[in-house]
């Protein structure tokens, strides 16, 4: 037997008021939805009262309908804004929970550091570029003709034995005249780029050739079998030793400061005539200001110009070479060549602030 529904205006009004009060006090969406189910769901007093209107006398139905419409509207006006409020609060809480606290300490990944040697070589290149010279890298595996013969080293010249050259087994190359028969070597000096550059670029020529060279030295505090040089070559009309000295002085100032200066001492190199040892003076030398040997230089030997098909009666030139490792040792506190080749990042980090 179906339950008889009775319309009780006071009871339904009280229950709706109770539901509205609970809506106002709800603290989360789950609680709010439960209140809606209790006070506006299928089994709620409001729903039952609405159904009971049909059993009322005709003269009471109109007033009962108005009352139920008002109660539903009151309940909805309380529920809607509260639902929006609690949804916004839930979204803010979720965003706050996902926020990264930037003040928390993090595990930083260690940073590397540039090795001081390539940085020094860039500084040297920048110096020559600032004067309008070109940079020529040359070849590390080179024809013996370019490394020795074209530079006025005779077949039995003592320098060939003294430098203990690495020869590349089973390979031969063409010399400048196109004749096959020149052995391939791992270059012992960046001077090997001189005649090749003259042949390919022509004159006038102003180049700097920084790069690696290779000799059979044992690695110790002052030697390494792989090291770096920078060779500079200028060939033009009317060049003299005065031009050479001017460039050397400017390079010394660029590398060692405004008080640095150079001097030349007579020497001998097959590819220059006259030749000179290049000495450097600068105030920050270890042990106090003084002179140190820095490199070699001289006027290009006429035989070298002839190797490139250039008339030495028309053109003259000068050349000089300095060791990059030696330059770095002179202008820093490095005392052992091992530090330059062992790849310890702690060593490179010492030079970061100077970049």
From Swiss-Prot:
Localization annotation: Cytoplasm
Gene Ontology process terms (BP): phenylalanyl-tRNA aminoacylation
E.C. no: 6.1.1.20
Enzyme class: ligase
Single GO MF annotation: tRNA binding
Keyword flag Protein biosynthesis: yes
Self-association state and partner proteins as the record states: Tetramer of two alpha and two beta subunits.
Protein name stated in the entry: Phenylalanine--tRNA ligase alpha subunit
Species assigned in the record: Bifidobacterium longum subsp. infantis (strain ATCC 15697 / DSM 20088 / JCM 1222 / NCTC 11817 / S12)
Organismal lineage: Bacteria, Bacillati, Actinomycetota, Actinomycetes, Bifidobacteriales
């Amino acid at each position: 037997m179906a339950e008889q529904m009775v319309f009780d205006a006071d009871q339904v009004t009280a229950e709706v008021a109770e539901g509205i009060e609970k809506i106002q006090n709800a603290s989360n969406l789950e609680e709010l939805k439960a209140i809606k189910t209790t006070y506006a769901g299928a089994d709620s007093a409001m729903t039952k009262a609405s159904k009971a209107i049909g059993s009322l006398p005709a003269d009471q139905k109109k007033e009962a309908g108005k009352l139920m419409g008002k109660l539903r509207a009151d309940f909805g006006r309380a529920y809607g804004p509260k639902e929006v409020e609690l949804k916004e609060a839930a979204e803010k809480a979720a965003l706050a929970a996902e926020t990264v606290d930037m003040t928390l300490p993090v595990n930083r990944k260690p940073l590397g550091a540039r090795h001081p040697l390539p940085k020094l070589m860039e500084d040297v290149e920048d110096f020559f570029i600032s004067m309008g010279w070109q940079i020529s890298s040359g070849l590390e595996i080179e024809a013996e003709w370019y490394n020795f013969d074209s530079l006025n080293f005779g077949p039995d010249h003592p320098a060939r034995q003294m430098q203990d050259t690495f020869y590349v087994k089973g390979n031969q190359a063409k010399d400048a005249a196109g004749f096959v028969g020149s052995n391939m070597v791992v270059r012992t000096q960046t001077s090997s780029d001189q005649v090749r550059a003259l042949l390919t670029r022509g004159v006038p020529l102003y180049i700097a050739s920084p790069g690696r060279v290779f000799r059979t030295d044992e690695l110790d505090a002052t030697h390494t079998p792989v090291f770096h040089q920078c060779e500079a070559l200028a060939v033009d009309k009317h060049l003299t030793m005065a031009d050479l000295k001017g460039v050397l002085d400017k390079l010394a100032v660029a590398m060692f400061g405004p008080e640095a200066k150079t001097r030349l001492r007579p020497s001998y190199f097959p590819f220059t005539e006259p030749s000179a040892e290049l000495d450097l003076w600068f105030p920050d030398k270890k042990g106090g200001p003084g002179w140190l040997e820095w490199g070699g230089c001289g006027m290009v030997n006429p035989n070298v110009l002839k190797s490139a098909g250039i008339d030495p009666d028309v053109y003259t030139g000068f050349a000089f070479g300095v060791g990059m490792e030696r330059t770095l040792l002179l202008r820093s506190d490095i005392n052992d060549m091992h530090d330059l080749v062992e790849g310890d990042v702690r060593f490179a980090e010492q030079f970061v602030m100077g970049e």
